Amino acid sequence: MINNLKTFILLASLTALLVVIGGLLGGSTGMLVALLFAGIMNFSAYWYSDTLVLKMYNAEPLSNNHFVYHIVSELAHRAGTSVPKVYLINNSTPNAFATGRNPENASIAVTTGLLDRLTQEEITGVLAHELAHVIHRDTLINVVSATIAGTISGIANMFMWLSMFGHSSNNEEGVHPVVGMIMMIVAPLAAGLIQMAISRSREFEADAGGARISGNPQWLASALLKLDQANHEQYFDEAETHPATAHLFIINPLNGEKLANLFSTHPSTAERVARLRAMY
């Protein structure tokens, strides 16, 4: 409940930041343009982001006879939700993610490395975690937050280019060039931090929800420890090529030697494991 409230506050803050930036740059018209732009991007992301991300990772659909599909199907029926489509990514780095605009149009993807490295119980824990993301509609929340953050960065970049070519605003509703330059630097950073905080909050909720669906928090805790270790041992090439998708995965797939928690899309594995173990 606390994490859900936190997510709402963070999304509201992200939207407010977008409106403020639009207002500073273009007054009331700027506010409307910023919201309209974000709305168009969110509409596109809502309908097409799942297809796009699956293509990015060359994910192939698994047959209904595959044991992973059977696990997902059993977990979905246990949770009383639709059975997502299941995909396999041919990559030796163990990881997984969920995508889709709602439970009826959701997909779960796992890597070959995850199936090779984890036990069936640990795989079940991971799949339950991803199913919890689907049930909580975290895939939609993440798309919205990423889109708004991206819009803020885009507006900041646009202001930078306009300033470079001498097109800064001089009207009453315009913003002073110095203030604009400061905002250009600070706003994308603030938006990114808020987006990352939303992602971290949703991971905790999915951990708890997944543990309840599988019936054993230890399965996910054990899987997270193995996945975290693997993340230190090898690179996930496709994820490094598409860093904007890092927040989708159960473990941060990027190998940048552990930035401070403030700048991470995921909570620390140690804290996640501790919370899971405290459930029993």
From Swiss-Prot:
Zn(2+) binds at residues 129, 133, 203. Its main location: membrane. Its EC number is 3.4.24.-. GO terms for molecular function: metalloendopeptidase activity; zinc ion binding. Binds 1 zinc ion per subunit. Its cofactor is Zn(2+). It is an enzyme of class 3 (hydrolase). Keywords: Cell inner membrane, Cell membrane, Hydrolase, Membrane, Metal-binding, Metalloprotease, Protease, Transmembrane, Transmembrane helix, Zinc. Pfam families: Peptidase_M48 (PF01435). It is a multi-pass membrane protein. GO terms for biological process: proteolysis. GO terms for cellular component: plasma membrane. It is found in: Cell inner membrane. The chain crosses the membrane at residues 7-26, 30-49, 146-166, 178-198. InterPro entries: HtpX_protease, Pept_M48_protease_HtpX, Peptidase_M48. The active site is at 130. Belongs to the peptidase M48B family. PANTHER family: PROTEASE HTPX. This is Protease HtpX. It comes from Legionella pneumophila (strain Paris). The gene is htpX.
